[in-house]
A protein has these predicted regions:
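Solvent-exposed, acidic/flexible segments
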Residues: 331-338, 439-447, 484, 614, ...
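Solvent-exposed, polar/charged alpha-helical surfaces in well-ordered, non-transmembrane soluble domains
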Residues: 336-343, 347, 448, 619, ...
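The catalytic-center signature of Zn2+-dependent metalloproteases
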Residues: 37, 44, 362-382, 444-501
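Auxiliary tRNA-acceptor-end handling modules of aminoacyl-tRNA synthetases
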Residues: 22-330, 348, 357, 363-414, ...
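Bacterial Sec-dependent N-terminal signal peptides
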Residues: 1-24
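Extended catalytic-interface subdomain
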Residues: 390, 395, 401-409, 450-458, ...
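Sec-exported extracytoplasmic/periplasmic mature domains
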Residues: 343-354, 455-456, 460, 496, ...
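Conserved catalytic/binding loops enriched for acidic/polar residues
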Residues: 467-837
């Protein structure tokens, strides 16, 4: 009862307080009406534009207005832009020394959109385009319910715009902070061993508004610690982390409005090598979900007044040409060659009906332009010792439309192309016979790399199969190769014509790669304007065109990127027969090697140049061996549509595979003593160091006996029958070649023979180390065959038994002590392998 009374008393008290407050409010209001000066309660929620944006504010007009007042930045976002996709691209503008990253390189890329939230808030979502349905379809609601995009930021609406059709939000803390949408990704921070953001040392440098984009420049400092001495760095260690305990980056974030109407998609075709994007498409009338895969390319459209000319086949200029600017930090003498590498693509665009479609230009002296601005495509020049260049692009994920590209050009790529050109052509081009090329030669090397990387930014993938469509003997035909080039595609890793012999007298035009038949055809496929907005109808038009052209010209074949088992599609190779091409290449390497002491000589050099170029010779020799190796157990893959004749998969012909095995016996397993010239090696190579020639021999032998290759040979023979190499034939050919005269084998051959027996032992009795290695390969996506219960193990045992018999016969006629010891050792190893104790 006491509790009830207490509660009742409390209720009465609360009611009195509420009524008292009401009375005060009424009294205050009455007093105000009578002229008494009383303060009104503060107004909550967004203010009007006049109340919030003062005369002190500095305003920029753009895709949305940017206001700066009282040291804060505000975005004024029109309601019409809510729900519109924008792409946010964050790049390094300046980086800490030793980071192995460079100003202009991309940090992060997100598709975002703004939307109204509850309680007067504006949300930013990151859009992940996984699936899509037409909004008029009933299933569109189910798709929307299944794929909710994450909210990555929430902003209070501080005020409404002048006409109340926009929302003003404070973005200061968002850009100063560490939100992944406009900062380093978690992966990048782990890579640099960074911890928390130091907010007191992070700030906004500037925000600039443009008609279709906003550019935000920020400085961000992260706390960091160096790894303990002797411990692994666990990433990309930055010296500043050890010196200062912090790392500072200057970043540029471009927020670019995507087109209201996406470009018409061109559906991906595996017979033409384009980068692609994709999403899952749903519709009410489907019986099977469709994965929409489409090519990545620029939008080229004729001006309305030129449309009829274009249809008649006249060359016309596109509404918006593709322009690449060269970084003003580029050494002046190389700028014309980089620009030429861009403009060289016009010959391909003419096949698609365009003139002046692509233009290389110097960076203008214009303070309104920024190298990091996402509206501009730029060749960025990096002061780096990295021997490389790369060609990325940023595209609209809805359509594949390329929006911009920042080509990465490392200063030391010149070292790479120098060594390539010298080791591949010095036998035939006197200009290649020195460690420092003249500017014209180096400029033309830069031009070829520029064209290759620009090709990537246009959407083109590597075509490693292109060079296989040139017969080897045509590479020595001066008239033909100077007119057509040694490969049909500059997107191949065909480098230079190493097949050409001195007596062929082929000039540089027959040694350098160029934009070829395939490149022109691929650009024609990707950039011909059909005017067709229906992707399926566009595909029908292009499919017939592809079939007709491939039937007429086999040089248009796209062979992929060398990641399968097709020997026609390899990196760094030439011609339609790897054995013949490599024999010519080795002839030239022999000519080059004997001249290296003279060609590498420079004042004060302590044989570093000779050592470097000897390594390049061995490396090139090793590449030739790898080209031949791919033929053994090779499977040809030629993508086709149902309208084309023939199979997609076929074995590498038996005769070619046997030729490869014979090549190894002649060029590799018979010790290549020409690479062991003591007069050269004694200048720089200590004999106790690892022998590079032996390393090449061992690597190829182990690859020939790799369980995955042997298993592939068995499955190919099962599928293709007599047209494929049989496993027992391959193993017999290898054993007979390797042990042709065991009693006279030199130390290199003896080491190889021991390796052979050890590899077969490993097939029969796999160790835990090899099994763990196989498991690791599977874990990272590489297939690894389980051969324990297959013919591979049976054949390995059979080969050891055959070898044991032949060794016993050789032993009877062997008198050399080293050879006898070797034979006895092999017999012991075989016995242990066949009957492990």
């Amino acid at each position: 009862m006491r509790k009830i009374l207490a509660i009742t008393s409390l209720c009465v008290l609360m009611t009195s307080l509420v009524n008292a407050q009401r009375n005060v409010t009424i009294a205050d209001t009455s007093a105000a009406g009578a002229g008494a000066k009383k303060e009104l309660p503060a107004k909550t929620g967004p203010k009007s534009f006049k109340e919030f944006i003062t005369k002190k504010a500095v305003t920029q007009k753009g895709v949305f207005s940017v206001h700066f007042q009282d040291d804060k930045f505000y975005f004024d976002i029109q309601d019409s832009l809510l729900g519109r996709e924008l792409i946010a691209v964050t790049r390094y503008a300046k980086v800490a020394g030793g980071a192995r990253k460079y100003g202009g390189e991309e940090v992060n890329e997100q598709t975002i959109q703004f939307e109204k939230g509850p309680n007067n808030r504006l949300f930013m979502r990151v859009v992940t385009l996984i699936s899509k349905a037409d909004s008029t379809q009933t299933i569109a609601k189910a798709v929307k319910n299944s794929y909710l995009d994450p909210i990555v930021a929430s902003f209070d609406i501080k005020a409404y715009g002048k006409d109340s059709t926009s929302s003003i939000i404070d973005v200061t803390d968002f850009f100063k902070g560490d939100n992944q949408a406009v900062s380093l990704s978690s992966f990048e921070k782990r890579n640099f061993n960074l911890s928390s953001l130091a907010s007191d040392r992070s700030y906004i440098e500037s925000i600039k508004a443009y008609p279709i984009n906003i550019e935000v420049r920020t400085v961000k400092t992260f706390n960091a610690s160096a790894p303990m001495p002797g411990s692994p760095t666990g990433g990309n260690f930055i010296p500043a982390a050890a010196n200062a305990g912090a790392v500072t980056f200057e970043l540029n974030t471009s927020i670019l409005l995507l087109p209201k109407t996406p470009m018409a998609r061109r559906l991906f075709d595996s017979r033409v090598g384009y980068f692609a994007d994709n999403f899952v498409e749903y519709s009410d009338n489907q019986q099977k979900v469709k994965n929409q895969v489409f090519a990545v390319r620029y939008r080229l459209e004729p001006k309305p007044e030129d449309l009829e000319k274009y249809k008649r086949g006249e060359l016309v200029e596109p509404i918006k040409p593709i322009i690449y600017y060269v970084d003003p930090a580029t050494p002046k003498k190389w700028v014309p060659y980089l620009i030429a590498g861009v403009n060289d693509w016009n010959i391909a665009f003419e096949k698609a009906g365009w003139k002046n479609a692509i233009q290389g230009k110097e960076w203008p002296n214009d303070s309104t332009m920024s190298l990091e601005d996402a509206r501009f495509s730029v060749i960025r020049y990096f002061a780096s010792d990295i021997e490389n260049a790369y060609g990325p692009q940023v595209h609209d994920p809805r359509s594949g439309e390329i929006l911009e590209s920042h080509v990465g050009w490392y200063h030391n790529v010149m070292s790479l192309v120098h060594d390539w050109y010298m080791v591949q052509t010095a036998a035939v081009d006197p200009a290649a016979r020195k460690m420092h090329f003249d500017d014209t030669l180096m400029g033309n090397l830069i031009r070829f790399v520029s064209s290759h990387e620009i090709g990537h930014t246009l959407g083109l993938r590597h075509n490693m199969g292109s060079s296989s469509k040139t017969p080897v003997e045509k590479l020595r035909d001066k008239t033909w190769v100077e007119a057509n080039g040694h490969t049909a595609s500059i997107m191949d890793y065909a480098r230079f014509n190493y097949v050409a012999q001195p007596e062929d007298k082929i000039s540089q035009s027959g040694l350098f790669p160029r934009i070829g038949d395939y490149d022109k055809w691929a650009i024609q496929w990707g950039y011909t304007y059909t005017g067709e907005n229906d992707a399926q109808e566009d595909r029908k038009i292009n499919n017939k065109w592809i079939v007709d052209n491939l039937n007429k010209n086999p040089r248009l074949w796209f062979g992929g990127e060398g990641r399968n088992d097709d020997p026609r599609a390899q990196t760094e190779d030439l011609g339609d027969n790897a054995m013949l091409a490599s024999e010519y290449g080795i002839k030239n390497l022999k000519r080059i090697l004997v001249n290296l002491p003279e060609w590498t000589k420079e004042e004060g050099d302590r044989y570093e140049n000779l050592s470097q170029m000897y390594g390049q010779v061995v490396g090139q020799f090793s590449r030739y061996m790898g080209h031949v190796l791919r033929n053994v157990g090779g499977v040809q893959e030629t993508f086709k549509s149902v309208e084309e004749k023939g199979d997609v998969y076929a074995p590498t012909p038996v005769a070619i595979q046997k030729q490869a095995m014979q090549f190894f016996n002649t060029q590799l397993f018979t010790t290549p003593k020409w690479l062991l010239d003591a007069s050269i090696l004694n200048k720089f190579a200590n004999p106790v160091s690892n022998e590079r020639v032996q390393s090449v021999q061992t690597s190829i032998l182990k690859s020939l006996l790799d369980k995955n290759r042997l298993y592939r040979i068995t499955t190919s023979h099962t599928r293709f029958g007599a047209s494929a190499y049989a496993l027992n034939d391959m193993m017999d050919d290898l054993r007979k070649g390797l042990f042709s005269d065991v009693s006279k084998a030199d130390i290199y051959r003896r080491n190889l023979q021991k390796t052979y027996v050890s590899q077969l032992d490993e097939l029969i009795n796999p160790t835990s180390t090899s099994m763990n290695a196989a498991s690791n390969l599977v874990r990272i996506g590489f297939p690894s065959a389980d051969v324990e219960n297959t013919d591979v193990v049976s054949e390995a045992k059979a080969q050891l038994k055959k070898l044991a018999t032949s060794l016993q016969a050789s032993k009877a006629i062997t008198t050399d002590a080293n050879a006898l010891n070797h034979i006895n050792d092999l017999q012991d190893r075989i016995k242990q392998a066949l009957d492990p104790k």
